[in-house]
Amino acid sequence: ILYLLRGGLPWRMLPPCFPPVSTVRRWFYLWRDNRLWLGINHALLMAARETRGREASPSAGVIDSQSVKTTESGGPRGYDAGKKIKGRKRHILTDTEGNLVHAVIHTADIQDRDGAPLVLAEIVKRFPWLRHVFADGGYAGNKLKDALRRTAKWTIEIIKRSDTAKGFEVLPRRWVVERTLAW
């Protein structure tokens, strides 16, 4: 997996030192469907937090999304009118240190505030103490606040740019999720 992620290679271009492509692909999809990758991410996140002297389960997170173009035909995709991109949207939640807690991929036409409950509903059981979320202005609105309260008593704090800022501005709490998306 790390080999494919690093090189961005299609399955058929795996080097000959690997097992047959069909075997590697079959095991990857089997592990994905059994949610093994989620379990691995969960264990690594908790271990990394404990190593740094933090509680294993985060109590706060930072949510954001990123629209990306898709060139392939077929598959789910939509049009993000705000970013003028036809493709998919990566919706991620990180802890306050920028470690990935959960990610959801969906069509780009889903607004941020409509995609947030999809991300947060998945992690209620795995991270029971995570109840506060920092977000940007795209998540503002009572519709999202009501949905989060119904899901699991979430609270959301919108971190906005100052009205006088020009150009790029590092925002407290928000920069960690931006860094994670950039990687």
Pin down the residues of each PLM region.
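Short alpha-helical elements
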Residues: I1-W183
